[in-house]
């Protein structure tokens, strides 16, 4: 269904002479990504509203989307499974952040571990996202800066909203775990 909608949108652009026919596959793929992203984000937002956890949800989405856009990480084989993993990750972050309060020491620990993991693993290579070495270095630097920024925001929020601060903390952990899972899969594939 996703492919069908993306194909219809792309054909409409071709008919309106907005894009060339040679760009058909690229635009179909782009629309598939956009629709999948909007679906997952909307689903998470709806859950946040229903569960009355809007601030935690916004914190999750900001950290999860911004950081992953520069670090890469686990990619599901289907758009449905991608939405499922995103929703599952969100649910786990929401659940854990509702029960566990984080301290400055937790943040300092995740800051050190996170920077090391980002230096070693980020950004993850993806076959559909070709990058040159300079872009990879740029993405690595941006991901480290974003990570540090979110840690700083999380620390600051411990004084205002511990639940939102915890949501940021556990979203950072989730991002690192998904980055690590993807990297382990790449290493296993290279060994095979």
Language-model features: locations:
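Hydrophobic alpha-helical transmembrane segments in multi-pass integral membrane proteins
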Residues: 93-106, 147-162
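Structural signature of hydrophobic alpha-helical transmembrane segments
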Residues: 47-60, 106-114
């Amino acid at each position: 269904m996703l492919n069908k909608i993306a194909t219809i949108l792309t054909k409409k652009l071709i008919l309106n002479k907005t894009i060339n026919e040679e760009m058909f596959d690229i635009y179909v793929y782009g629309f598939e990504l956009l629709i999948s992203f909007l679906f997952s984000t909307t689903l998470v937002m709806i859950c946040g509203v229903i569960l009355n956890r809007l601030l935690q949800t916004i914190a999750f989405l900001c950290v999860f989307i911004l950081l992953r856009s520069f670090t890469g990480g686990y990619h599901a084989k289907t758009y449905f499974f991608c939405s499922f993993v995103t929703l599952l990750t969100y649910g786990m972050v929401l659940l854990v952040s509702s029960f566990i309060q984080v301290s400055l020491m937790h943040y300092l620990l995740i800051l050190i571990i996170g920077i090391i993991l980002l230096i070693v693993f980020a950004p993850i290579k993806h076959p559909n996202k070709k990058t040159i070495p300079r872009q990879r270095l740029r993405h690595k630097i941006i991901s480290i800066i974003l990570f540090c920024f979110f840690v700083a925001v999380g620390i600051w929020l411990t004084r205002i909203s511990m639940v939102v601060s915890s949501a940021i903390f556990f979203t950072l952990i989730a991002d690192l775990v998904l980055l690590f899972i993807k990297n382990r899969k790449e290493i296993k594939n290279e060994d095979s």
